[in-house]
Amino acid sequence: VIFRQLFDSVSGTYSYLIASRRGAEALIIDPVLEKVDRYLQLMNELDLRLVKAVDTHLHADHVTGLGALRDRTRCVTVMGEHTKADVVSLRLADGDKLDIEGVSLDVIYTPGHTDDSYSFTMDDRVFTGDTLLIRGTGRTDFQNGDARAQYDSIFNRLLKLRDDTLV
């Protein structure tokens, strides 16, 4: 499996590039608009074809790269079914699968930080967007956030995953 964690220091956003192998289909989670050229360069270096670009939620701290990636690669843009974003061509529900060649992610609805927050699990990893952060959680005081829903998402969904799950 190809797994690259990419960091945008301006917004503090982690993005993730995933594929089963060189020359395969790829997906990217939480792309930042200003980093689109870098993502495309990396995919070219790894001989990957972007087929899906995913946002875990509507972001207030950066402009999403979904639209630019769709326009430049014709990839499918993906978010959870509760999103109000208009750039989305595929909306997923809790319990759905997000599949590309050789890789499958499970979809978990994890509202709280926003009302459209979703997490994605892949083997021993979970991609939580801003639901869980390093040393904390995402804010709940804007974007239809709800502290009680976030508590429930963290303690009754995410912390119920296997103990060896990487966040």
Regions found by a protein language model. Name each.
Residues 1-49, 119-128, 135:
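Conserved beta-strand hairpin/beta-sheet module of binuclear metal-dependent hydrolase folds
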Residues 5, 62, 82-84, 91, ...:
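Residue-level preference for alpha-helix termini and adjacent loops
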Residues 7-8, 110, 167:
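Short beta-strand
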Residues 12, 23, 33-109:
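Active-site HxH/HxHxD metal-binding segment of metal-dependent hydrolases
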Residues 18, 30, 57, 69, ...:
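Divalent metal-coordination and catalytic microenvironments
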Residues 24, 104, 114-167:
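Metallo-beta-lactamase
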Residues 28, 58, 139:
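Generic anion/oxyanion-binding catalytic loop in active/binding sites
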